[in-house]
Amino acid sequence: MDNRGLRLFIVEGKELKGSDNGGSSSDPYVKLKFNGNSFKTETIKNTLSPVWNQSFDIGIINVNDPNAIIEVECLDWDRFGKHDSLGKVQLPIAILREAATFGQTDKWLNLDKKGYVRVGFQFNPPYPLQQHISPDGNPNIIQNQIQQQNLISSNGQLPPPVYYEPIYLKTHPTVLEAEFILPNDLYQKTIYVTGEPVRASLVLYVNQPIVVRSLFVSLKGKTSVCGKKQKELIQDLRNLLHTSIGPSSPNSQNQKVALDIGKHIYPFEFFIPKHCNSSIDGVGNYKVLYRFQFNADIVNLPDIQLEREITVVNIEDTVHRMTQSQIHEKCSKSPLTGGTIEMTITAPKNSYYPGEDIELQVHVNNSSKKKVKKIELELQRTISIQHEKGVPTQVLKVSKNFFPKIQQNQQSTQIVVMETPQTLLNSIYQSGIIKIEYKVRAVLDILDCIDLYTIFPVNIVLPDPKRVILPNPLDELSKIPRYIQDWTPRNLLSWLYFRMNCPEVVTSNPEFYQYCLSGNELLSIPDTILLEKVLKGAGTRTTEIHNAIKIEIDRVLSVRTILKDNQLPHLIQTFENELVTFDLLSSLSSIDLSHLTSTIGDRIRLQNAFEKLKLNN
C-alpha cells in the first residue's frame, strides 16, 4: 500500500459549454467529489474561459487503489433553480500517479459535454523522477538538467547546456559526409516529447585527415502561416568541439581540431520547453516545424551543411492528456402519427487516436407507427485558422441497416464501427491561431418521416509517443544478408532482436543507437568497443552475443587471412562478391575455383591451402 497526500489545483477552463445568454457565456465553477467529500471553487461570471487558481487538500490516498477516482464536474451557477452541468469527467488517481513519475504537474481534462478543465496536482511525499542515463552512464548529468526545467516556463530561459565526450571509431569511410542519428529510428520515426531532453548524435565520416575550425549543431522550432514565420518556439545552439578542445580553454572559439580517418560521433542534447506545440505539417497554411541543423567549417575543403526535420509531440495532444469520458447521447422525436422514436448512442470513451476504431452502441426504441430503416454515422472535421471559422467537412461515413426494419413497439441495439484513417489529424486548440475539432453526426433514417439526428463531439489524440512497434520478425530475418560485411545497421538490430532474442542489448543501453554500426564497421572496430560499449546492455549474455558476432566476423576475416598468407590478396574482392565464407572453403570444387580465378597458379595455390585446412580440421 502506497499512501500519499494529494493536493489538487483547479487552474482554468477553456471552450466550456455556454449556458447563458443564448449559449454565449456561463457562470462556471468546479465541484470535486472524492470519498464522500466535496470541494467547490469560486464562481467566475460571464465567461467560457475561466481562471480559478484554487487548491484543495484531497487527503491521504492509497495511490495504488484502482477504485480511487475523483469526480470533476463543471457547473453553471444560477441564482434561481438548479445549477446546470457543463460537463463532468472521472479522474483516476492512477493517471496522476503515472504522470507524476514523469515530472508532470498538470493535465487538461476533457469534459463529457464540451470543453476542458486544467488541473494541477502535487503528491506528498513527491514521486522521484524516472532516472535518465547519459550516454557515458552518468545519471547525474541529465538529472541536474531535469531539476532546472521549472526555469523554462517561468522566465523563458533554457537550462544550461549539457555536453558529452565525442566517440571515435577507426573505420574506413570512402567519402567525407555527415548524418544525424536519432534514437530508435531504424524501425520507426523518432518522436520527441516536449518538457523532456532531446538526444541525438551527429556522425561525421572522415575519409582523409582533416582540420576543422568549428562544428555547430542547432535546434530550431517555429510556427508559420502562409509560409511566413509567426512565432519562434525554440532556437538553441551547441558547439560540438566544446569537449574536444576543453570548455575552459580561453581561446576555444579560435582553436582548430584535427580529425583522423574514421567515424566521429558527437552525442548532443537539447531541451524543448513543455509549452511548445506539436509538429504540424499540411493543415491549411499552418505549420509547426522543428529541425536539427549542422554546419562544419573545414580547412581547405568545402563546408558541410546538413539539416533534418524532427517530430515533436506535446504530451497534452496525446492519449496521456485525456481521461476517459463516456459518450452518452440521447435524442428523440414524435411523428405526427403519434408515438415516439428514441435513439441512444453510448461508448466507453470519447478520445481516439488515428487508426483506432470508434465503436459506438446504438439503441433505438420505436413506439411510433413509423419504420426505422438504418443508422448513418458521419465523422466531421472543422479546421479554423486564426479568426476564420472553418466549415465542417466529412472525413468518413458509415451506415448500418436494421434487418428487419424496426417496427412499432420494437427496439434494437446495434454496434457500429467507424474505422479512422492512420493519417487523421489530431484535435488542436491554440487560441487565436488554429482549432481542429471533430464531431460525429448520427442520422436515423425513418421511412416517410423527417430523419432523427444528433451531433456530439469526439477527440482525436496522438498515440503514446513512446510506444515501440517492432516489425515482423520473419520479414526482418529474411532480409539479413549472409555476409556480415553487407549488413546495414538495421540488419544488426534485427539480428540482435530476433536471431539472438536479446533486445536488452538495445533497450538497456541508451548509447547503443549512437554507434549505428554497419557490418563493414563491425569488421574493423576493436573488441573492447564491442564488449564495453556496444553490447554492454546484454548483461550476463554479453559474452555470448559477442562470441556470436565474432563467429560471423571470422567467417569473413579468416578468408581474407588465408588469401593474404598465400599471396592472393587480389582475390579477396572476388571471394566476397561470391559470398564465399570460411565455412565454405573446404567445400569448393575445382570447377568453383576455375570460376573464382582463371590463373592456373592461383588455383593450385588455393587447392593446396584448402587441403592443409582440411587436414588441420
Curated annotation (Swiss-Prot):
Disulfide bonds: none annotated. Ca(2+) 2 binds at residues 20, 76, 78, 84. Keywords: Calcium, Metal-binding. It holds the Pfam family C2. GO terms for biological process: aggregation involved in sorocarp development; biological process involved in interaction with symbiont; G protein-coupled receptor internalization; polyphosphate-mediated signaling; protein transport; regulation of adenylate cyclase-activating G protein-coupled receptor signaling pathway. It comes from the Eukaryota. Ca(2+) 1 binds at residues 20, 27, 76, 78. One of its GO terms (molecular function) is metal ion binding. Its cofactor is Ca(2+). GO terms for cellular component: cytoplasm; cytosol. Residues 1-109 form the C2 domain. PANTHER family: ARRESTIN DOMAIN CONTAINING PROTEIN, ARRESTIN DOMAIN-CONTAINING PROTEIN B. Belongs to the arrestin family. This is Arrestin domain-containing protein B. The lineage of its organism: Eukaryota, Amoebozoa, Evosea, Eumycetozoa, Dictyostelia.
